[in-house]
């Protein structure tokens, strides 16, 4: 049981590390964060390390939506709310890992 639990945590860590490392092509580089607003620094191993945590402007969508409804952003982790006229939406700007 302990071995299985260890393997689950190890695979989860590898998956997250692999996803984050794709953003860095060289150590020490500064790249745009996954939220599209903040910036992150790449570690010596080339993985995303330290990111700014500025408040980002609201994200908008490019198609109409049903007024007042909420839905998941295309990134899969942020949530959006449709405006009263159905022409815009405001979305959260969480860092998605």
Curated annotation (Swiss-Prot):
Report keywords, A-Z.
Disulfide bond, Protease inhibitor, Repeat, Secreted, Serine protease inhibitor, Signal
> According to the UniProt entry, where is the signal peptide?
1-20
Q: Name one GO cellular component term.
A: extracellular region
The answer to whether the entry has keyword Lipid biosynthesis is no
How would you summarize where this protein is expressed among tissues? Answer: Expressed by the venom gland.
Q: Where is this site: Reactive bond?
A: 93-94
Which residue ranges does the record assign to the Pacifastin domain? 22-59, 62-97
The record's listing under InterPro entries reads: Pacifastin_dom, Pacifastin_dom_sf
Residue span of region Pro-Pro-Arg motif necessary for proteolytic processing: 57-59
Disulfide bond entries:
24-42, 37-56, 40-51, 65-82, 77-96, 80-91
Q: Where in the cell is it found?
A: Secreted
Per UniProt, what is one GO molecular function of this protein? serine-type endopeptidase inhibitor activity
Q: Does the keyword DNA-binding apply?
A: no
Please explain the role this protein plays, according to its UniProt record: Inhibits trypsin activity and prophenoloxidase (PPO) activation, an enzyme essential for both clotting and insect innate immune responses. It does not inhibit activity of chymotrypsin and protease K, and has no effect on phenoloxidase (PO) activity.
Q: Which family does it belong to?
A: Belongs to the protease inhibitor I19 family.
Q: What is this protein called?
A: U-reduvitoxin-Pr11a
What is the organism of origin for this protein? Platymeris rhadamanthus (Red spot assassin bug)
Lineage, please? Eukaryota, Metazoa, Ecdysozoa, Arthropoda, Hexapoda
């Amino acid at each position: 049981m302990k071995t299985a639990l260890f393997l689950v945590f190890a695979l989860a860590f590898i998956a997250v590390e692999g996803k984050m490392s794709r953003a860095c092509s060289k150590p020490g580089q500064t790249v745009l964060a996954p939220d599209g607003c903040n910036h992150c620094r790449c570690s010596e191993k080339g993985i995303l390390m330290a990111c700014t945590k500025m408040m980002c402007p609201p994200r908008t969508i490019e198609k109409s939506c049903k007024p007042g409804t909420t839905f998941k952003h295309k990134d899969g982790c942020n949530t959006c709310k449709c405006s009263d006229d159905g022409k815009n939406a405001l979305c959260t700007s969480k860092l998605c890992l």
